[in-house]
Structure formats: structure tokens, C-alpha cells
Amino acid sequence: MKGLFIVFEGITGSGKKTHIKLLAEKLKESGKEVTVLSFPNYESEIARFTKRADLDAYTQSLLFAADRSLYQERIKALLEKGNVILCDRYCYSNFAYQAAKGLPLEWLKEIEKHTIKPDIVFLIDVPVEISMNRVKQLSIEDFTKKEILERLEREKDFLEKIREIYLSLAVTDKETKWFVINGSEDISVNHEKIWKKVKEKLKIE
């Protein structure tokens, strides 16, 4: 029995983690085996290396791709067992963030061409202003929150570019099925939309 591979994408503060948590709970209630993954996985040495300030964008992109490459056999095995994989970011984050820095999108796709493609990508789309407001409301240490908000403020235009690239990928990527979710809407409304699509795919009554 083949499992289902679902990826959630979106800018910081879009609500990916919330929707992954809600969907995981619903799937478990339906008797499904669920595995949650997140990329970059900063527990791996490769991903930690990407935080070095002296790295150029090309090297960083290759390291992010290598981090995902380490997990391909595990993803394959889980899918063969019938698991549902929920992934917080995948290769599309590399495409959007690095292309926004000016790297060629075709090159970014080339270095990730051997990654297992998901069955569904949910793009949780929110305007940058909303993403910043949500970060303000997060229950995290004030210093960490201040640091994130300062970075978001500095990178406002950059985040707008990332958002545009994500929306473009949702239209042009023919290798997998994308669903754009209006992340400005009520969480419970969006959860029901997501659950409806997943139920259809898994043939859950």
C-alpha cells in the first residue's frame, strides 16, 4: 500500500506548523500512520552548516539540497509502508528563497531533480504584513521574537519576492498538485479545506 506525501509551503508566519498539527491529529483519528518531517533539519550537520555567514547562495542551495537528499530513502520506505508524510517545507522553499536572491530557478530545480516529489503541496499564502503580525503574537521569548521581527522588517521586499515565486510555482509546476490556501482566512475554515482534499486523496469517508 502506497502512502501519501504532503508538503506545506509558505513564508514565515503563514501558519504551516498549525495546519500540519491539525492535519496530523485528524489523520491519526482516522487510523493513519503519520510522520512529520521538517526541512532544513538543523539536527543534521549539513543543515547546521548552512547557517554560516560566509556561504554564498549557490553553496547554501547545494547544502539544503544535500540535507533533503539524506532523507530520500527514509521517505521512500515510509511511503512503501503506507505512512502519510507531512512535511514542513521541502525543495520548493529552496526554489523560492534562493531564486528571490537571484539564483536561476532552472538550476535550483536541476540540483533537486532526484528528490521524491510529493503528491500534494499546500501553499499557505499570506501577505507579508499578516505574517509579521502573527510573529508578534507568537508565544516565544521576547528577544527571539524581536530578532525575527527585525529580520522580517529588513527583508520585507525579499519576502514579497518569495511569495510571488511561490505563487508562480503553484501555477507552473506540473510535477505535483498544488493547492493555494488563503492563509488570511480563519484557521478552522482552511483546515476543513485541507482535510477535504486529503480525504479525497486517501478515500476516507
Describe the residue ranges of each PLM region:
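Pre-Walker A (Motif I) flank of P-loop NTPase domains
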Residues: K2-F5
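Conserved lysine of the Walker
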Residues: K16
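ATP-dependent small-molecule kinase phosphotransfer cores
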Residues: K32-I116
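Hydrophobic anchor at the beta1->P-loop junction of P-loop NTPases
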Residues: F8
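P-loop (Walker A) phosphate-binding loop of NTP-binding proteins
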Residues: I11
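Hydrophobic positions on the alpha1 helix immediately C-terminal to the Walker A/P-loop
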Residues: H19
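A glycine- and Lys/Arg-enriched "phosphate-lid" helix/loop adjacent to the NTP-binding pocket
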Residues: N94-E164
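NTP-dependent small-molecule kinase module
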Residues: A24, M132-E205
